[in-house]
Amino acid sequence: MRHRKSGRQLNRNSSHRQAMFRNMASALIGHEIIKTTLPKAKELRRVVEPLITLAKEDSVANRRLAFARTRNIETVAKLFNELGPRFAQRAGGYTRILKCGFRAGDNAPMAYIELVDRPEVAEVTAE
């Protein structure tokens, strides 16, 4: 029985799941918005939100903890230099999940996961 077991398995073994969320967290922190399946987005929220909370207080120990969880220097630099100060006054809820229909190949529910308060990007229109 799976009583009181939190988290989703997502049909992967534990090391594959850990590597996938490590890569997805780096992508979300780098791009500030990514498109993925809805269950993966919901699980990714559980990985990224503690990282941003960790980045609110810049210390060597916190940087090492963040690096241990992401294994990416650029991600850690952006976390502590940009995202930590940006979310300093916000007590949690750093991400937003927007449903965006179903994938054409297998009808999987898709979603955008983004960081709230991300800077607006001017859209380029084709002329």
UniProtKB/Swiss-Prot annotation:
Keywords: Ribonucleoprotein, Ribosomal protein. GO terms for molecular function: structural constituent of ribosome. One of its GO terms (cellular component) is cytosolic large ribosomal subunit. Gene3D superfamilies: Ribosomal protein L17. InterPro entries: Ribosomal_bL17, Ribosomal_bL17_CS, Ribosomal_bL17_sf. GO terms for biological process: translation. PANTHER family: LARGE RIBOSOMAL SUBUNIT PROTEIN BL17M, RIBOSOMAL PROTEIN L17. Part of the 50S ribosomal subunit. Contacts protein L32. Belongs to the bacterial ribosomal protein bL17 family. This is Large ribosomal subunit protein bL17. It comes from Haemophilus ducreyi (strain 35000HP / ATCC 700724). The gene is rplQ.
